């Protein structure tokens, strides 16, 4: 089922290639959308695609991301949005 999720990651998630590692994994899983650093030190992402693949991507970000220490993450259901690719926003 196609779905879109907005996710905020908190903890040690900036300055450790979190966004670029997420981009690589998203491309591997066929997830589209974007990811960006926020001024408060968190990272926000919008993941769009098959719900199972999005869950795998979130799990990777939370549990298997090199050097990251995700203390908390919030997931929000969004209206489905179609993207052409996955981007790192600056």
Curated annotation (Swiss-Prot):
Record's keyword terms, sorted: Hydrolase
Cited Pfam families: Acylphosphatase
Residues at the active site: 19, 37
Keyword field contains Plastid: no
PROSITE patterns attached to this UniProt entry: ACYLPHOSPHATASE_3 (PS51160)
The reaction(s) this protein catalyses: an acyl phosphate + H2O = a carboxylate + phosphate + H(+)
Domain of life assignment: Archaea
EC number(s) per entry: 3.6.1.7
Molecular function via GO: acylphosphatase activity
Domain Acylphosphatase-like span(s) in chain numbering: 4-90
Signal sequence coordinates: none
Protein family membership: Belongs to the acylphosphatase family.
Protein name: Acylphosphatase
Organism field: Thermoplasma volcanium (strain ATCC 51530 / DSM 4299 / JCM 9571 / NBRC 15438 / GSS1)
High-level lineage: Archaea, Methanobacteriati, Thermoplasmatota, Thermoplasmata, Thermoplasmatales
């Amino acid at each position: 089922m196609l779905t879109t999720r907005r996710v905020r990651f908190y903890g040690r998630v900036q300055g450790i290639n979190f966004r670029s590692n997420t981009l690589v994994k998203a491309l591997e899983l066929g997830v589209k959308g974007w990811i960006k650093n926020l001024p408060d030190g968190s990272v926000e992402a919008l993941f769009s695609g098959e719900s199972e693949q999005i869950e795998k991507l979130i799990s990777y970000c939370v549990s298997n991301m090199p050097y990251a220490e995700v203390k908390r993450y919030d997931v929000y259901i969004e209206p489905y949005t179609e993207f052409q690719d996955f981007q790192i926003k600056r």
